[in-house]
Regions:
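Substrate/ligand-engaging "lid" and interaction regions
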Residues: 1-410
Length: 410
């Protein structure tokens, strides 16, 4: 069963659906012969994987005669080679492959790794050409929060379905699958026609950028702002009368302005993200998001800050305040409610912040953090007006507190 929990257009949904389309499961480590026989089925056409980010990797110790190869791309190469031989290189027997691992351009990476195995195992040019011409490996982007097995709800679920299902999976309502593939692939695999949020697109790059910018970007700045205001859960931050407005400003007025996708599409995506942040079933602690905040800001928010400045001729106040909040969080100490502030990051970042805050001078703190090229890959003091803006926010947070500082930019 799949247990979907969350908000859908503002309504609370908690559904249970039986999955009845899986005919069997094979373990290639104990049933390798049956696993390889799959390649002999003429009607076989699609391969879909999610072996995590670490799964698409080349292991040079894998051998063709291993039963099976230890790596996923190794097993897939064995399967493809067996199919190639079974059907004597018939070009109509190629496979369409959709890797779902969260790696940018995962299809390209998987394809490269298969080529490495073809060369390592000397499988020949004929097979290489068949793989190139008869098979398609397509880049995808998946987006859905899947907490997995619902430990705390499983007794109630078993009571409801009246049998022992130990494979229940819990997930949020929102789902998106972007597939970088031509229209003929969409015709063969019309998942978008089944009422699912599946998009076939010429390039997944803008969607990858959209997710990183509009979902991960706001997470990174809202977390320290919320935490230093005494708010611990993402949902509570969204519903807070001041921080909620701050999150909205960062998403809709700042980050959205830096992306090159249709406005309506971005607006819809941002509204979906807010609904996900408001999920009554997921208590997402802001402290878990704040782990490694500096590298996260560098990849998720800094590109938006630069693009906004370039396009608007001024700095985005919300993103600047987010950076000041991160720097303040790394000062440590205690919150107004007495909770101890315990930042967590790479030792060199922790040591730098400790050293800078020990000076007691916000100018030195600002210049020191923005000038740390090992964090940013450049000196951010060179961005016009940034040093002054971050210092002003740091001063305001020290003097008036976080909430009053946030009110000042709304």
């Amino acid at each position: 069963h799949v247990n979907l929990q969350g908000l859908d257009k503002g309504e609370v949904v908690n559904s249970l659906t039986m999955i009845d389309v899986i005919s069997r499961a094979l373990n290639p480590y104990t049933q390798n012969d049956e696993f390889m026989k799959l390649a002999e089925q003429p009607e076989m056409r699609f391969v879909i994987s999610n072996t995590t980010e670490a799964g698409i990797a080349f292991d040079p110790t894998c051998k063709l005669e291993d039963a099976p190869a230890s790596s996923y791309p190794g097993k897939l190469t064995q399967l493809l080679y067996h199919r190639f031989k079974t059907f004597n290189g018939d070009k109509t027997k190629g496979l369409i492959i959709f890797p779902c691992e969260l790696i940018f351009l995962n299809g390209h990476k998987l394809k490269e790794t298969i080529y490495q195995y073809i060369d390592l195992w000397n499988l020949g040019n004929e097979f290489k050409t068949w793989f190139e011409e008869a098979c398609g490996v397509y880049a995808t982007l998946v987006d859905r929060i899947v907490p997995g097995f619902p430990r705390k709800d499983i007794a109630a679920i078993k009571e409801k379905i009246q049998y022992d299902d130990n494979l229940v999976v819990q997930a949020e309502i929102f789902h998106l699958w972007v597939i970088e593939a031509p229209q003929e692939v969409a015709k063969e695999f019309p998942a978008d026609k089944a009422g699912l949020n599946v998009l076939f697109v010429p390039s997944e790059a803008p969607y990858h950028e959209r997710k990183v910018t509009l979902l991960n970007g706001p997470h990174t700045v809202l977390s320290p702002v919320a935490y230093l205001s005494g708010v611990n859960i993402v949902r509570d931050a969204c519903q807070h009368e001041v921080i909620g407005k701050y999150i909205h400003k960062v998403m809709f007025d700042e980050l959205m302005e830096t992306l090159n996708l249709p406005k309506e599409e971005l607006k819809k995506f941002a509204e979906d993200v807010l609904e996900r942040f408001n999920n009554p079933f997921v208590d997402h602690a802001v402290t878990s998001i704040m782990l490694n905040s500096f590298p996260k800001y560098e990849t998720r928010d800094l590109p938006g800050l630069k693009t906004y400045l370039e396009r608007k001729g001024e700095l985005p106040k919300g993103l600047v305040l987010g950076l000041a909040a991160i720097i303040t969080y790394y000062k440590g100490g205690v919150r107004a409610d007495g909770a101890e502030i315990v930042p967590n990051d790479a030792p060199e970042i922790m040591n730098l912040l400790k050293e800078l805050w020990a000076t007691g001078c916000t100018k030195k703190v600002t210049e020191g953090v923005l000038g740390a090229e090992f964090i940013w890959g450049e000196d951010l003091n060179k961005i016009p007006g940034l040093t002054e803006a971050v210092k002003a926010d740091l001063d305001s947070i020290q003097e008036k507190g976080m909430l009053e500082t946030v009110k000042g930019i709304l």
